[in-house]
A protein has these predicted regions:
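Surface-exposed amphipathic alpha-helices with a cationic face
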Residues: 1-2
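N-terminal Rossmann-fold cofactor-binding loop
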Residues: 5, 10-15
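Glycine-rich NAD(P)-binding loop of Rossmann-like domains
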Residues: 5, 23, 164
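General small-molecule cofactor/ligand-binding pocket signal
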Residues: 9, 25, 122
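Generic signal for short, ordered secondary-structure residues
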Residues: 12-13, 41, 121, 125
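Rossmann-like adenosine-cofactor binding region
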Residues: 14-111
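Rossmann-like dinucleotide-binding domain for NAD(H)/NADP(H)
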Residues: 65, 72-167
Length: 167
C-alpha cells in the first residue's frame, strides 16, 4: 500500500510492531482508525478477541466512500451488517476474499446474502495468499524458527492456544 502513497495506520493486540507504519495502536484505538481510513485491510487471525469485531457500529464509523478489504477470516465481520451497509451505501466498497460458508472441496459455494448482486463488491475465492514467492517466504520463516529453537531461543510468532479454542 505504501507504494501507492498510503499512510499506514494499524492496530494489533500489543500496540507494537516491527513494520514501518505511521501509527500503531491497540484494539482500543480501532474506532479512531476506522473513522480515518480510506481503505481498511483486514489481515488478522480469527480469535476470541477478533470474532465479529467489525459490525454495524464499526461500519457506520467508517467513511461512506471507504473500501473494506478482508483477506483474513470472514468471522471477523458480521456478514449481515456488511451486506446491509454495502446495500445502503453504494459509495462504500468491499473486496471479500474470505467467506462465511466456505465449502469443502467439490461442494457448492453459497452465501446467506446476495453480495454478488451488489455493484460495490468484488469477491474472490479465498486465494489472496497465493502470490509469487509466498511459499518460499513461509518456508524461510519456518526454517528461521527451527534455527531459533535449536539455539535455545523462543520461536517467533508464538500464539496462545486458548485465544483460538472454542472459536
Amino acid at each position: 500500500m505504501r507504494a501507492f502513497g498510503a499512510r499506514i495506520h494499524a492496530v494489533n493486540t500489543s500496540g507494537h510492531t516491527t513494520e514501518e507504519v505511521e501509527f500503531i495502536g491497540t484494539l482500543a484505538d480501532l474506532d479512531k482508525v476506522l473513522a480515518a481510513a480510506d481503505v481498511l485491510v483486514l489481515s488478522l487471525p480469527l480469535t476470541r478477541a477478533t470474532r465479529g469485531i467489525i459490525g454495524d457500529r464499526e461500519l457506520v464509523l467508517m467513511k461512506l466512500t471507504a473500501i473494506l478489504v478482508n483477506v483474513a477470516r470472514a468471522g471477523i465481520i458480521d456478514e449481515g451488517a456488511l451486506y446491509e451497509h454495502l446495500r445502503a451505501n453504494p459509495d462504500f466498497s468491499a473486496g471479500i476474499d474470505t467467506w462465511w460458508h466456505e465449502p469443502p472441496l467439490g461442494e457448492d459455494f453459497r452465501t446467506d446474502y446476495p453480495f454478488f448482486g451488489l455493484p460495490n463488491v468484488l469477491g474472490s475465492p479465498h486465494n489472496s495468499a497465493i502470490v509469487a514467492g509466498s511459499q518460499a517466504v513461509a518456508a524461510r520463516h519456518a526454517a528461521q524458527n527451527v534455527r531459533r529453537y535449536l539455539r535455545g531461543d523462543s520461536p517467533a510468532g508464538i500464539v496462545r492456544r486458548e485465544d483460538y479454542a472454542g472459536r
